[in-house]
């Protein structure tokens, strides 16, 4: 009888683990407002409004259990990610916007909750690559408030956009 009980417990546990689907959630934002006084500067810092928005993003993510924070290697994306990363005691991991959502990235982030800070022309593209469809167009150059949330549960992918004003 003891053997059958253990066998039944093993089978039940195995079946339960097979039906449990990992959830992966990506939060994708564009960097906050940047200094625009020097149009030749390809790597500007955040302006005062941008610094405030970056702080607000940190507040937004306060109660969300992030596992990782990614940003491109630009001042404005690093500065946008910084308050959230500091609040979560996480390093900011750099990613190449020309190599978005690779197999390696998908594997490393599977089952995790991740913040990705990019640009107006990379954030929607990144979301589209995760989704495997062309759902979103490039963002307006003045849109620093959109938050793309992409969730993967098993093979099901969903997404939505929220606005943080």
Which positions does each model-derived feature cover?
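Positively charged n-region of N-terminal signal peptides that target proteins for export
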Residues: 1-4
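Sec-dependent N-terminal signal peptides
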Residues: 6-10
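C-terminal motif of bacterial Sec signal peptides marking the signal peptidase cleavage site
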Residues: 14-17
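Active-site-proximal alpha-helix that buttresses catalytic centers in soluble enzyme cores
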Residues: 20-107, 123-126, 133-165
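Generic beta-sheet signal
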Residues: 26, 110-118
């Amino acid at each position: 009888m003891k053997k059958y009980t253990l066998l039944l417990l093993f089978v039940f546990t195995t079946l339960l683990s097979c039906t449990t689907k990992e959830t992966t959630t990506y939060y994708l934002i564009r960097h906050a407002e940047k200094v625009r006084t020097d149009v030749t500067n390809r790597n500007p810092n955040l302006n005062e409004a941008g610094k405030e928005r970056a702080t607000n993003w940190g507040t937004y993510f306060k109660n969300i259990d992030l596992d990782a924070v990614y940003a491109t290697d630009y001042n404005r994306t690093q500065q946008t990610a910084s308050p959230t990363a500091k609040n979560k005691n996480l390093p900011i991991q750099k990613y190449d916007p020309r190599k978005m959502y690779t197999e390696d990235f998908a594997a490393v982030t599977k089952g995790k909750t991740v913040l990705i800070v990019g640009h107006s022309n990379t954030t929607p593209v990144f979301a589209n690559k995760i989704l495997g469809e062309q759902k979103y167009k490039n963002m307006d150059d003045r849109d620093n408030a959109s938050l793309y949330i992409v969730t993967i549960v098993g093979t099901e992918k969903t997404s939505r956009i929220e606005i943080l004003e």
